Amino acid sequence: MTVYIWIVAISVAMTIGTFFHHALLRNWYDVFLALPIWLGWFLAATALYFLLLYLISLTVDKSKPVRKKEPFFRWLLNQTVWLILHLGRVEIQCTGLEKLEGLSSFLLVANHRSNFDPFIAIATCPQADLAYIAKPEIFDIPITGRIVHKCFFLPINRTDNREAMGTIKYAAKLLQKGVVSFGIYPEGTRSKTGELLPFRNGAFQIAKRAGAPIVIVKTSGTELIAHRFARKRTTVRFDVLDVLEGSAVSKLPTREIGDYARSLML
């Protein structure tokens, strides 16, 4: 939460400075000016942060593969995720995090209800260095596409099975080496009704090839964030349901893994 705290601190300092510089505290009721002045400085500081983030993102060449971890870009990703969740007034309630103790890298499998789902997972598991396999359009979004590229997020072409399998093999290699953990949404798309969609079990090949644990998670409430953003507090849940050990994952067919994970999420 470092960036968020700095933005709040800077905006408070600038508000105090504004009062003293312009001698605004001449009457007792002038204190009511503090909130709008602070809000103005807060928005200005936030805008400045995103401007700096944009300028930093311009240094990233998405055509070049990432060869090693980039701690600075991971820090930027984590800080920006926390900032956005704070701006959106999102509160995360978690259960089962103790099941992740001792896990260095894993495949996180969850239901998909909102574009904010990855934000919640990254904010909840910052130590995991989560990366996602995502649709190619994500990498065309200004700032976002370049930052996540540096954090080993991978685009997958679902219209080309051979290319998609190449992405899965590369993700398995990164997972096996412990470079990052990966998150996937086996439904393949967001559920607009809240009902769990059929699973595409091929993505479980990432964990099978890597011999890595699978962390099964259920999220709820994320579909409300966009509608309430900043206007109303949103409480979301992040529940770790079970962890399948890597040795078991290697032996199980992907269909059985998918059926088991889906049964827990229902």
What feature does the model see in each segment?
Residues 2-105:
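Membrane-anchoring hydrophobic helices of lipid-metabolizing enzymes
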Residues 7, 165-266:
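Non-catalytic C-terminal accessory region of glycerolipid acyltransferases
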Residues 57-77, 86-87, 101-161:
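Catalytic core of membrane glycerolipid acyltransferases/transacylases, capturing the structured
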Residues 94, 154-157, 246:
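Short acidic-hydrophobic, aromatic-tinged amphipathic segments that line or gate anion-handling sites
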Residues 87-89, 127, 148-150, 177, ...:
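Short, well-ordered coil/turn elements that cap or connect secondary structure elements
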Residues 94, 108, 132, 238-240:
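Generic preference for hydrophobic
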